[in-house]
Amino acid sequence: MQQKKILFIINPIAGINKKKKVPKLAHQYIDSNKYEVHIAHTQYAGHAKLLAKKAVNDGFNVVVAVGGDGSINEIAQQLIHTDVALGIVPGGSGNGFARKLGIPIGRKQAIEVLNEAHTIQCDVGLMNDKLFFSNAGVGIEALIVNRFAETKMRGFVSYARWALHYYATYKPQKYTIRCDGMSFEKKALFINFSNSGQYGYQIGVAPELSDISDGLLEMIVVEHFSKWRALYLLPMFMLGKAAKVPYVDVIQTDKAHLQCESETDAQIDGDPAGKGADFEIKILKGVLKVIVPSI
């Protein structure tokens, strides 16, 4: 059997824990009859994208993202429309994309999944000119993401602290939404487009509707609600039942257009994506090969 070339791209600062043990684990648990293991560490923002592009050009068969949804985004951008498979060893804060695919959060177990070499073709989202793999959104959730990115403290507690801080003062925006031949207005705290059905941290978004290969996105529109109702909404998200909340609308669509009354924050896969008032969103069906557990 001819060995395939596999490259692990490690983001050493993603998430809460460092990734120092991954190279050792990769050499220890990857089947050497199947793969020739290579390791690379990112050194600055955007470096993962360059490493992945070089790997494609150099004939690698698998490129593994060791990090969170942001790291996956940088790497997977270079793999769409190619025969190079994306592997994932979760190492971020939320790990929403990996959770949706059933990839173990444990490093050893995630590495062992790569030996199975079982692949599926995943959909990819596009917001204006930016690709997303787990989800993208605008409004207060994106504002929170922007502030979360600026803090050194990672994890759910830090994210929740920023959420509580901004909810008290955030003013909902009015959006004009067009999709599936409809046009309507909503005053919303945020609008999220989910490919994976996951925010991360086990927080689900209409998981019963989400299929990462169905050619559809779930558009989640969350209207303004009282602070007391916030105590109800979070558990419903944690249980994957947000779609059953009266002030949450979930619409499946393959494309949509948002127009906001003023510029608002945007996020892509949990990373800041600037500001804007006009957003075109669509799905690219089955353009990314990903290694997932066979069962």
Give a label for each model feature.
Residues M1-V63:
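ATP/NTP phosphate-donor binding region
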Residues K19, C179, V221-I295:
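ATP/nucleoside-binding phosphotransfer catalytic cores, i.e., glycine-rich phosphate-binding loops
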Residues K130-A136, E185-K186, F190-S194, Y199-G200, ...:
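Short hydrophobic-aromatic micro-motifs
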